[in-house]
Amino acid sequence: MEMFQGLLLLLLLSMGGTWASKEPLRPRCRPINATLAVEKEGCPVCITVNTTICAGYCPTMTRVLQGVLPALPQVVCNYRDVRFESIRLPGCPRGVNPVVSYAVALSCQCALCRRSTTDCGGPKDHPLTCDDPRFQDSSSSKAPPPSLPSPSRLPGPSDTPILPQ
């Protein structure tokens, strides 16, 4: 019996990690419908737009001996294929570009956090509200402007993944 326990311990230590679950977690990482608040500094309006974002669970691993072995990279739900759409905010003063672009998720994947497509800093307290305090009451518009320009592909920031420290 002691030999069996020793062999089992050796097997666990040699793996270095264990899966959080053998069954896929539900709901898995996938595009979902979402309503986002859109505003721009200098424009006196905050509107909401309907889009798709990546959300859901990704399988992760954890070390059995966390103090002895280095941390494993953790994956998060990221955009795989994305297109960018643009809208024109109404009522922006002269000299302020009224065009705002936002991502539309076409497909998603579990991967290291990519700053070009993912907010790696954690959840926002109120993702459906505007940051400007003037727009946090019920007077903000809840519908997109009637005329939306055609979608455009915009260059994104560098695609540098965040690695664990």
UniProtKB/Swiss-Prot annotation:
Listed GO MF terms: hormone activity
Pfam assignment, any one: Cys_knot
Chain intervals for the UniProt region annotation (Disordered): 131-165
Keyword entries, A-Z: Disulfide bond, Glycoprotein, Hormone, Pharmaceutical, Secreted, Signal
Compartments in which it is found: Secreted
Origin: domain of life: Eukaryota
A Gene Ontology term for the protein's cellular component: extracellular space
Segment forming the signal sequence: 1-20
Biased composition (Pro residues): 143-154
Intrachain S-S bonds: C29-C77, C43-C92, C46-C130, C54-C108, C58-C110, C113-C120
Residues with attached carbohydrate: N33, N50, S141, S147, S152, S158
SUPFAM superfamilies from the UniProt entry: Cystine-knot cytokines (SSF57501)
Swiss-Prot/TrEMBL GO biological process terms: apoptotic process; cell-cell signaling; female gamete generation; G protein-coupled receptor signaling pathway; hormone-mediated signaling pathway; signal transduction
InterPro entries xref list: Cystine-knot_cytokine, Glyco_hormone_CN, Gonadotropin_bsu, Gonadotropin_bsu_CS
Tissues in which the UniProt entry reports expression: High expression in the placenta throughout pregnancy.
Function according to Swiss-Prot or TrEMBL: Beta subunit of the human chorionic gonadotropin (hCG). hCG is a complex glycoprotein composed of two glycosylated subunits alpha and beta which are non-covalently associated. The alpha subunit is identical to those in the pituitary gonadotropin hormones (LH, FSH and TSH). The beta subunits are distinct in each of the hormones and confer receptor and biological specificity. Has an essential role in pregnancy and maternal adaptation. Stimulates the ovaries to synthesize the steroids that are essential for the maintenance of pregnancy.
UniProt miscellaneous comment: Encoded by a cluster of genes that have evolved by duplication from LHB. HCG-beta is encoded by six non-allelic genes (CGB) clustered on chromosome 19q13.3 and named CGB1, CGB2, CGB3, CGB5, CGB7 and CGB8. Two specific hCGb proteins that differ by three amino acids in positions 2,4 and 117 have been described: type 1 (CGB7) and type 2 (CGB3, CGB5, CGB8). The CGB gene first arose in the common ancestor of the anthropoid primates.
Complex formation: Heterodimer of a common alpha chain identical in LH, FSH, TSH and HCG and a unique beta chain distinct in each of the hormones.
Family: Belongs to the glycoprotein hormones subunit beta family.
Protein name: Choriogonadotropin subunit beta 3
Gene: CGB3
